[in-house]
Regions:
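Short alpha-helical transmembrane segments in multi-pass integral membrane proteins
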Residues: 1-15, 69-133, 177-231, 288-355, ...
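Helix-loop interface residues and adjacent transmembrane-helix termini in multi-pass membrane transporters
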Residues: 26, 35-38, 72, 149-150, ...
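Alpha-helical transmembrane segments of multipass membrane proteins
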Residues: 26-30, 100, 142-146, 168-173, ...
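Membrane-helix interface/capping residues of multi-pass secondary transporters
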Residues: 29, 38-41, 153, 182, ...
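Short runs within selected transmembrane alpha-helices of multi-pass transporters and secretion channels
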Residues: 62, 129-148, 156-167, 185-200, ...
């Protein structure tokens, strides 16, 4: 199979898988909006940064260890076998603080994220349940990344889609027929990665599998080597959480809970968009790492060009759909028919999503830099879009233009980051 055909196979399957992951958060938002209105949407938006932090750690461990595994395996280095077990062990270590917070102080965490008394009371049960399942969220990321890098992207996609379908169906069953409310939504979301891991585990019993569990203690050295290549994934995931936190605080100050609920609508659709571009980056990563391990620089560059072109085409298609159907798209999560929330979300969607013309390229380029063992450049791109540029732009533009400035901060920061990314790519290429 040609490199181009392999690329489209891996990327398409990974996009579908990650779309499934983001769709279960959309399902949460929809059912919660039906059950609890704008307060429920505001609660979920305050919880999204916590989800992002959990997924960011899983991404750093999973993508970093799997990338290191793919490079060493292409070079015939037997040390590749140790990275899978090490990543799983460290996931359990990193998950422990989240589990303890879920048991002892979920209300403190919700207050820290900006929740008022109403939101905290509403969300304690929801937060407690999903925090207790943190190990499964992290391990799901790791298992899926290794299955994909071991030549089985189809199984990784099926596992993710099945987990997401379970979440959507049981969101409804737990919340409404069974009457569990918000804790029911959290339970459906929490069990979803357990099912995905179980399906992915089939791969390890195949004769073609080269991924093995190795009896070992957690190795800080292997962790550092993995995180070196996974830090861009960490920052990429964290960027959504940080953006959400900063925007929530700014919008609370500018217009209160209704503005936060409006951003909840924007942020949930943004998760879907980000999943599409992460699908391109993560789908190409095993092939790029394989080319790099075999010293095939031309093949790696070809994959970068394919990824960049795909990202631009997808951004154009995405914005065309969003621009044409902004009203109905916003209305899906506006169960109370709040005219003010609809107004805020309408303008927010059209301004915010311009950023994906740049963000798609930045995500693909950061993934490429990590896959070819250039962690410093990958981290610079991710840090710019995830922390430095987005915080600076949101503070400056919100002071100048109010709410429209908050929405414009995302495209402005991504445009700045794209300039930096092009410079970093040209510096060595």
């Amino acid at each position: 199979m040609s490199l181009t055909k392999q690329y489209f196979k891996y990327v398409s399957q990974n996009i579908f898988g990650l779309l499934g992951t983001s769709c279960y958060i959309l399902a949460d938002t929809y059912f919660i909006s039906q059950a609890s209105g704008t307060s429920g949407v505001a609660l979920l938006n305050l919880c999204l940064p916590i989800y992002n932090f959990i997924f960011a750690i899983g991404s750093m461990l999973g993508l970093g260890a799997a990338t290191r595994y793919a490079i060493l395996r292409a070079q015939g280095d037997e040390r590749s076998e140790r990275y899978f077990s090490n990543a799983l062990l460290w996931a359990l270590v990193f998950a422990l603080p989240f589990m303890l917070a879920g048991i002892f102080c979920p209300e403190v965490l919700l207050r820290f994220m900006g929740g008022d008394a109403e939101i905290v009371t509403l969300g304690v049960g929801y937060a407690r349940i999903f925090l207790l399942f943190t190990p499964f969220f992290m391990c799901n990321y790791i298992v899926s990344a290794f299955v994909r890098n071991d030549g089985d992207p189809s199984l990784a996609m099926v596992a993710t889609l099945c987990g997401s379908l379970f979440n959507v169906v049981f969101d409804y069953i737990f919340m409404f027929p069974m009457g569990l409310g918000l804790p029911g939504a959290a339970l459906a979301t929490a069990v979803s990665p357990v099912l995905s891991i179980a399906i992915c585990s089939r791969h390890f019993f195949k004769k073609s599998s080269t991924v093995r569990l190795v009896r070992q203690l957690p190795s800080p050295k292997l962790l550092a080597q993995s995180c070196q290549l996974g830090v861009s994934g960490f920052v990429g995931e964290m960027s959504s959480g940080l953006t959400t936190t900063v925007f929530n605080l700014l919008l609370l100050r500018l217009a209160g809970n209704v503005a936060v609920a409006a951003y909840g609508v924007v942020a949930n659709y943004a998760l879907v968009a980000t999943a599409i571009f992460n699908g391109v980056a993560q789908g190409a990563q095993p092939l790029v790492s394989r080319c790099y391990g075999k010293n095939d620089a031309a093949g790696a560059r070809k994959l970068l060009l394919l990824g960049s072109g795909t990202a631009l085409a997808l951004a154009a298609a995405l914005y065309a759909v969003l621009f044409g159907f902004t009203g109905p798209i916003v209305a899906v999560f506006n169960s109370e028919n709040s005219a003010l929330m609809a107004q805020y979300a309408f303008s927010g969607m059209r301004i915010y999503f311009l950023g994906y013309f740049f963000a798609g390229f930045n995500i693909v380029a950061a993934g490429y830099l990590g896959a070819v063992d250039r962690p410093a450049e990958a981290s610079a791109t991710s840090l710019s879009r995830g922390i430095v540029a987005i915080v600076a732009c949101s503070l400056v533009l919100s002071a100048l233009f109010g709410m429209n400035g908050v929405w414009a901060a995302f495209p402005a920061s991504e445009a700045i980051t794209a300039c930096l990314t092009i410079f970093l790519l040209k510096r060595k290429n």
